[in-house]
Design a protein with these regions (language model features):
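Small/aliphatic-rich secondary-structure junction motif
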Residues: 1-53, 129
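Short glycine/serine/threonine/alanine-rich loop segments
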Residues: 31-32, 79, 103, 132
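General small-molecule cofactor/ligand-binding pocket signal
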Residues: 34-36, 82-86, 135
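Generic structural signal for helix capping and beta-alpha/helix-loop junctions
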Residues: 42-43, 91-93, 115
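A short acidic, glycine-rich active-site loop
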Residues: 52-65
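Structural beta-alpha unit
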Residues: 55, 72-106
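Glycine-rich, Arg-bearing micro-motifs that act as flexible, cationic patches
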Residues: 105-129
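Short, acidic/small-residue loops that bind anionic groups at enzyme active sites
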Residues: 129-137
Length: 137
């Protein structure tokens, strides 16, 4: 069905739903799951974290820690994961990885407002920028 599934990662409820669905799709089809997290453009990584530890749990900041947690979840169901920390706006980061990895599908979550689900700016921007199918959950 799919060889390459791309999903954005944050600690929001919508992103958690998107990751869960992307993980299900990847597991069912034997796809590689590409997990994208957006690193804000402001500033550089802290100078006190040596480069060899930048993307390990020893030097993990928020996005690094999140990617580690999601990798561990995917490993439990034998899904290959490629982590992509990208210094860009979330929609740009997802679209960039989707293009680079020739994604078959991108999975994004909806935002929520007072219990109702709505399509936020990031899913709309992703839909405008990618050339593959987009699943909004």
């Amino acid at each position: 069905m799919f060889d390459t599934v791309v999903v954005g990662a944050t600690d929001s409820a919508g992103a958690r739903r998107a990751f869960d669905r992307a993980l299900e799709l990847a597991a069912a089809s034997g796809a590689t799951l590409h997990v994208v997290t957006s690193i804000p453009r402001k500033g550089e990584p802290p100078p006190y974290v040596p480069e060899e530890f930048r993307y390990t749990d020893a030097g993990a900041d928020g996005p690094d820690w999140l990617l580690g947690q999601l990798r561990a979840r995917a490993a439990k169901v034998n899904v290959d994961v490629a982590a992509h920390p990208v210094r860009a706006h979330p929609a740009e980061a997802i679209a960039l990885v989707a293009a680079q990895e020739h994604a078959d599908i991108v999975v994004v979550g909806t935002g929520s407002s007072r219990g109702t689900r709505h399509l936020s700016r990031v899913p709309k921007a992703v839909m405008d920028r990618v050339a593959c199918a987009v699943l909004v959950v």
